[in-house]
């Protein structure tokens, strides 16, 4: 009887460990929508002409860990306005996919580009504040931005 109880407990423990092994890796994984927000949203500030803005933000948002991300764009608009782009003009993404959308109006953005000669771990960026239409890839339920594809000038 005691042997049976021990065996049942052991089997239960093994089963629990197996389930935790399958579930646990997905618990800490950042969703594509959250990654988009971390890498591209800066609603709390306006476009900065400060030459150090990109250096600070790229470090703060963990985009200089292990390598220097060559290009990144921050959007200075409310998140809901950027999410609404997913229901505006449908365009083809740079990679040929059909899930990109262009904003109806210009948005305040800051382009960050790695400066020539800049090498990890000393990533240095050029800061360029702009007003442009943004193009984002959207997916999921709810349908939200998951990739910043491009920014384009007003065509009028």
From Swiss-Prot:
Catalytic activity reported: an [RNA] containing cytidine + H2O = an [RNA]-3'-cytidine-3'-phosphate + a 5'-hydroxy-ribonucleotide-3'-[RNA]; an [RNA] containing uridine + H2O = an [RNA]-3'-uridine-3'-phosphate + a 5'-hydroxy-ribonucleotide-3'-[RNA]
Report where it is expressed, by tissue. Answer: Pancreas and other tissues and body fluids (indicating it may have other physiological functions besides its role in digestion).
> According to its UniProt record, where is this protein located?
Secreted
Composition bias type Basic and acidic residues, residue spans:
33-43
Q: Where is the signal peptide?
A: 1-28
SUPFAM superfamilies referenced in this protein's UniProt entry, alphabetically: RNase A-like (SSF54076)
Single Gene Ontology BP term?
Answer: defense response to Gram-positive bacterium
Q: Name one Pfam family in it.
A: RnaseA
Q: What is its EC number?
A: 4.6.1.18
Q: What is the effect of changing residue 119 to D?
A: Substantially decreases binding affinity for RNH1 but maintains high conformational stability
So what does mutating residue 117 to D actually do?
A: Substantially decreases binding affinity for RNH1 but maintains high conformational stability
**Which parts of the sequence are annotated with region: Disordered?**
33-53
Alphabetized SMART domains for the sequence: RNAse_Pc
Query: What keywords appear on the UniProt entry?
Result: Disulfide bond, Endonuclease, Glycoprotein, Hydrolase, Lyase, Nuclease, Secreted, Signal
Disulfide bond sites:
54-112, 68-123, 86-138, 93-100
Q: Which GO terms describe its molecular function?
A: lyase activity; nucleic acid binding; ribonuclease A activity; RNA nuclease activity
An example GO CC term for this entry is: extracellular exosome
Q: Where does substrate bind?
A: 35, 38, 69-73, 94, 113
Processing after translation:
N-linked glycans are of complex type.
Q: Which residues are glycosylated?
A: 62, 104, 116
Q: Active-site positions, per UniProt?
A: 40, 147
Q: Which InterPro entries match?
A: RNaseA, RNaseA-like_dom_sf, RNaseA_AS, RNaseA_domain
Q: Which family does it belong to?
A: Belongs to the pancreatic ribonuclease family.
Purpose of the protein: Endonuclease that catalyzes the cleavage of RNA on the 3' side of pyrimidine nucleotides. Acts on single-stranded and double-stranded RNA.
Complex formation: Monomer. Interacts with and forms tight 1:1 complexes with RNH1. Dimerization of two such complexes may occur. Interaction with RNH1 inhibits this protein.
| Identification of the protein by name | Ribonuclease pancreatic
Q: What is the lineage of its organism?
A: Eukaryota, Metazoa, Chordata, Craniata, Vertebrata
């Amino acid at each position: 009887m005691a042997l049976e109880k021990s065996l049942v407990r052991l089997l239960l423990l093994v089963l629990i460990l197996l389930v935790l092994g399958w579930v646990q890796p997905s618990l800490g994984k950042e969703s594509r929508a959250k990654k988009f927000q971390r890498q591209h949203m800066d609603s709390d500030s306006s476009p900065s002409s400060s030459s150090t803005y990109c250096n600070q933000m790229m470090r703060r948002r963990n985009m200089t860990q292990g390598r220097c991300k060559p290009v990144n764009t921050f959007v200075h608009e409310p998140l809901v306005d950027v999410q609404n782009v997913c229901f505006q003009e449908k365009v083809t993404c740079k990679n040929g996919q059909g899930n990109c959308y262009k904003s109806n109006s210009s948005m305040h953005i800051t382009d960050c580009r790695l400066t020539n000669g800049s090498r990890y771990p000393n990533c240095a960026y050029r800061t360029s504040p702009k007003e442009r239409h943004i193009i984002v890839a959207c997916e999921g339920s709810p349908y939200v931005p998951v990739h910043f594809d491009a920014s384009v000038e007003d065509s009028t």
